[in-house]
From Swiss-Prot:
The keyword RNA-binding does not apply. This is Biorientation of chromosomes in cell division protein 1. Required for proper chromosome biorientation through the detection or correction of syntelic attachments in mitotic spindles. Residues 147-156 have a biased composition (Pro residues). Residues 1-22, 137-169 are annotated as: Disordered. Belongs to the BOD1 family. It comes from the Eukaryota. Transmembrane segments: none annotated. Its main location: cytoplasm. GO terms for cellular component: centrosome; cytoplasm; kinetochore.
Length: 169
């Protein structure tokens, strides 16, 4: 899934031709895209995901949601009269739609986020994101303010060798 600004390598990148990200206003979509790409390239989003997943199954909201879904599925399947001609895919899709339409997933996921993600947001994730942003903008500012390299020695110009003079004696 490529996003704008992806595929850049090294320290200098630009989205939409932005040469100095520090000059963009906070909240600018180009600046956000640059920062998100920087966080992705550092693997920080993967770290956040792993950190949250390590905690999720210990939280009451997850255990409660899992129990609700298990009960819902059992009740739904108990209402079905099984026969050999049943289409398992249709049954599975119908069950999936019923779970989604019940609204229990949305409410349960919101509770999981409030128990798992929210506590980490200000104390773990925000400081790491702010540090990455600061390092990125500092590196970009240094690149932009670095003095230009002095010109190298002039390249030799190719000249045709002089023709031998013909002297008549």
């Amino acid at each position: 899934m490529a996003e704008s600004g992806s595929g850049t390598s090294g320290g200098s990148s630009s989205v939409g031709g932005v040469s100095n990200p520090a000059s963009l206003a906070p909240g600018d979509s180009q600046l956000i895209a640059l920062i998100v790409e920087q966080l992705k390239s550092r693997g920080q989003f993967d770290g956040f995901r792993r950190d949250c997943l390590a905690d999720v199954d210990t939280k009451p909201a997850y255990q409660n949601l899992r129990q609700k879904v298990d009960n819902f599925v059992s009740t739904h399947l108990d209402k079905q009269e099984w026969n050999a001609d049943m289409n398992k895919n249709q049954l599975r899709n119908g069950l999936r739609q019923s779970v989604i339409q019940s609204g229990m997933l949305e409410a349960g996921v919101d509770r999981i986020i409030s128990q798992v993600v929210d506590p980490k947001l200000n104390h773990i994730f925000r400081p790491q994101i702010e540090k990455a942003i600061h390092e990125y903008l500092t590196a970009q500012t240094k690149e932009d303010s670095a003095p230009p390299l002095p010109p190298g020695p002039p390249e030799p110009q190719e000249q045709e060798p002089p023709e031998p003079s013909q002297s008549v004696s």
